[in-house]
Swiss-Prot record:
Domain of life: Eukaryota
Annotated function: Alpha toxins bind voltage-independently at site-3 of sodium channels (Nav) and inhibit the inactivation of the activated channels, thereby blocking neuronal transmission. Shows a high toxicity toward insects and moderate toxicity against mammals.
Protein name, entry field: Toxin BmKaIT1
Expression sites (tissue/organ): Expressed by the venom gland.
Keyword Signal recorded: yes
UniProt cross-references to InterPro entries, sorted A to Z: LCN-type_CS_alpha_beta_dom, Scorpion_toxin-like, Scorpion_toxin-like_sf, Scorpion_toxinL, Scorpion_toxinL/defensin
Domain notes from UniProt: Has the structural arrangement of an alpha-helix connected to antiparallel beta-sheets by disulfide bonds (CS-alpha/beta).
Signal peptide span: 1-19
Domain LCN-type CS-alpha/beta stretches: 21-83
Keyword Zinc: no
Leftover remarks: Exists in two forms, due to cis-trans isomerization at 28-Asn-Tyr-29. Adopts a predominately cis conformation.
Length: 85
């Protein structure tokens, strides 16, 4: 039984783990991408590795691109202010 656990763990380490998340994609300085159409967000999100994107008009950030299944290496909007220069 222990061998099975060790082999499974080794296989997991060899293959790597890629996780995804649903979030607002962020520009520099923690700013969202503003939008007016779903097509713009869908193109932006899929170009960055997401499954799809939309431009919701309700929610925390109104008229901002929201991506489904966005990879971990792409920046997302985190709590705090947008710090534009």
């Amino acid at each position: 039984m222990n061998y099975l656990v060790m082999i499974s763990f080794a296989f997991l380490l060899m293959t790597g783990v890629e996780s995804v998340r649903d979030a607002y994609i962020a520009q520099n300085y923690n700013c969202v991408y503003h939008c007016a159409r779903d097509a713009y967000c869908n193109e932006l999100c899929t170009k960055n590795g997401a499954k799809s994107g939309s431009c919701p008009y309700l929610g925390e950030h109104k008229f901002a691109c929201y991506c489904k299944d966005l990879p971990d290496n792409v920046p997302i909007r985190v709590p705090g202010k947008c710090h534009r220069r």
